[in-house]
């Protein structure tokens, strides 16, 4: 049968070819291994023929860092007690490249470092103890001399990154000879308390009922303006009060609203707070009070911090700034 013969032939000739192919593969594998071994030997030989490795020098600087008196002061007052890296020399890698920035002046950095320690850090230490601050304080402070402006024209006062780092801008605007408490609060301390409160609520969240008080009124990134028949108008704090917000920025979102209550309360007098509530009107004041009750209870019950006591300490320390030598490093 021709067909069966063809099948036999096909079956006969195909099988030996498969065995032969397998053998070829084995041979090729061995040849490849020998080639790689030979290549490795050549490379190692070439390396041995190169100049000896210079172990006496490193591509990394091993020279001791030269510290000035301010650096030593920062070690004693920030680094050793709290493990804080206080960066007053602007580092490009630590800066936000979308802004045009300049470094902080040395004298301004010295003054602000003393003010921050006395008014902000030591206030929490006085009330809650040094261990509390050691655990929760951001480990990096970065000072920038110039303001940071968004494309919208808004000036960024400060930023925080994951509870690890706080950047303060516009340091060069600090007038050491004429201390302005309101300006210090606006530029620095409202920001410091604001960002620190973020760290705390990210560790232990606040009552979610807070989010529902002004639900539907948050405007996100549009917090800085509102629309009228004449067009967009800047939204100032007093514009936000009747809507139940302590600042215009509090209208961004609930988390910002929460921490703005803390920042504004502890940095301002009761007279300021009462005037704000009156200007807010009955509805606005009721909303602010409802929110602040949650804020106050959270700080007291969760962290053992009475905001009334913290405010007394902060306001007292603000008045003591004029008694501090802001220029001399001892």
Language-model segments: which ranges?
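Active-site recognition of the HExxH zinc-binding catalytic motif
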Residues: 186-206
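Auxiliary, metal-adjacent structural segments of Zn-dependent hydrolase domains
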Residues: 110-165
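Metalloprotease/metallohydrolase-associated module, dominated by Zn2+-dependent proteases
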Residues: 221-292, 321-326
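Post-HEXXH active-site segment of zinc metalloproteases
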Residues: 204-227
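Sec-dependent bacterial lipoprotein signal peptides
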Residues: 1-10, 15-45
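Short pre-active-site segment immediately N-terminal to the catalytic Zn-binding motif
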Residues: 172-191
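Surface-exposed patches in mature extracellular/periplasmic domains of secreted proteins
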Residues: 124-141, 203-204, 208, 272-280, ...
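Acidic/polar, low-complexity intrinsically disordered N-terminal segments immediately downstream
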Residues: 47-128, 285-288, 292-330
């Amino acid at each position: 049968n021709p067909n069966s013969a063809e099948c036999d032939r096909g079956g006969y000739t195909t099988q030996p070819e498969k065995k032969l192919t397998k053998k070829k593969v084995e041979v090729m594998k061995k040849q490849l291994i020998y080639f790689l071994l030979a290549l490795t030997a050549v490379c190692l030989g070439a390396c041995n023929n190169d100049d000896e490795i210079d172990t006496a020098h490193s591509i990394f600087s091993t020279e001791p860092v030269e510290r000035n008196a301010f650096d030593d002061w920062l070690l004693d007052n920030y680094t050793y007690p709290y493990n804080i890296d206080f960066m007053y020399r602007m580092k490009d890698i630590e800066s936000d490249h979308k802004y045009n920035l300049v470094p902080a002046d040395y004298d301004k950095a010295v003054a602000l470092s003393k003010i921050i320690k006395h008014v902000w850090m030591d206030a929490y230490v006085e009330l809650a103890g040094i261990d509390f601050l050691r655990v929760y304080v951001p480990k990096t402070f970065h000072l920038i001399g110039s303001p940071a402006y968004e494309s919208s024209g808004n000036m960024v006062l400060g930023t925080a990154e994951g509870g690890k780092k706080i950047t303060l801008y516009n340091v060069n605007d600090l007038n050491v000879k004429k201390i302005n408490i309101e300006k210090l609060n606006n530029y620095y301390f409202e920001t410091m308390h604001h960002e620190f409160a973020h760290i705390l609520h990210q560790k232990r969240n606040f009552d979610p009922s807070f989010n529902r008080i002004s639900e539907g009124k948050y405007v996100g990134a549009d917090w800085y303006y509102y629309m009228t028949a004449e067009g967009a108008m800047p939204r100032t704090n007093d514009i936000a009060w009747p809507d139940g917000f302590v600042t215009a920025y509090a209208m961004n979102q609930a988390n910002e609203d929460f921490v703005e209550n803390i920042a504004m309360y502890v940095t301002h007098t009761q007279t300021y707070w009462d005037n704000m509530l009156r200007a807010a009107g009955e509805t606005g004041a009721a909303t602010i009070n409802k929110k602040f009750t949650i804020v106050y209870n959270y700080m007291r019950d969760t962290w053992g911090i009475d905001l009334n006591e913290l405010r007394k300490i902060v306001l007292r320390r603000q008045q003591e700034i004029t008694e501090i030598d802001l220029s001399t490093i001892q």
